Amino acid sequence: LAADGIAVAAVSRSLRAGDGALAGSLEETIAQIEADGGRAVALPFDLTAPGTDRRDIIAQATEAFGHPVDIVVNNAAGPRHFDVLFPDMTWEAFHEAVQTNVWAAWDLAAAAVPGMRERGAGWILNISSSQAGPRLGPPYAENPTNGAVLYGGTKAFIDRITTGAAMELYEDNIAVNTLAPEYQVATDNALTVAGVRKDNSEPEETIAEAALALCTGDPKKLTGRIAYNLSLLVELERPVRTLDGRSTLPGWQPNEIDSARLRVPYTQTSRIL
């Protein structure tokens, strides 16, 4: 987004390096964006803290940039608990996952809608997961925790909210979509999950490019999608650039992507009617 000239308000609990369990921080992110000529502001915020008013994020971003927010990307995700079967899931774990994966996205999007209406257009993107889809079988995978009931359930919830919100906000010229990686993206967080390796994952640039397409497309045409990154890139014939936007990414251009990797044939859309 920043490489495309969009001012970015980055939100995270980790303001400085070492604040969180994973590498990276808001300060490092802002420094990288500014070094590449972009404009960004850091908003340290814990979306799960009790009593948190998430509307403050939208208000602070609006004040920082001097105009209403017109793009919201909900990328926060709560605990997966893949190792816990649904009869053993605690109420606390369920509540935390719903608060982070569903309510946080709902609150932030809803808080931004008035400003989007004021500006005459807006884009809401919720990052989803292939875990939201139905588990196919029998036969099922040998590992029963692949059911991912809690994490997948919350992502399915946000998918359905997205398509409904797209319908409700269509006349306001506000696009609402979800985007998921075709398989997995080799982020630091993903690499902590068993079986995820850099050599069997997709580069970050593919989902970043697909997200940019959904956050800048015509709200009257590109909305209500339950989209997968590679399928969307092939459908739109969209070049995949490096994160700084200066060059294209070898091996991951639409004409180089193996069709066997696609969950949705490029001649179809993943729209739910």
Protein language model features and the residues they cover:
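C-terminal helical subdomain
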Residues: 178, 196-273
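Conserved Rossmann-fold SDR core element
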Residues: 7, 68, 159-165, 169-181, ...
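Conserved mid-core segment of classical short-chain dehydrogenase/reductases
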Residues: 22-27, 52-55, 78-95, 136-144, ...
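Catalytic loop of short-chain dehydrogenase/reductase
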Residues: 78-79, 91, 123-171, 182-185
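Amphipathic alpha-helical dimer-interface segment in Rossmann-like NAD(P)H-dependent oxidoreductases
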Residues: 100-121, 132, 166-167
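Short-chain dehydrogenase/reductase
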Residues: 1-67, 79-82, 266, 273
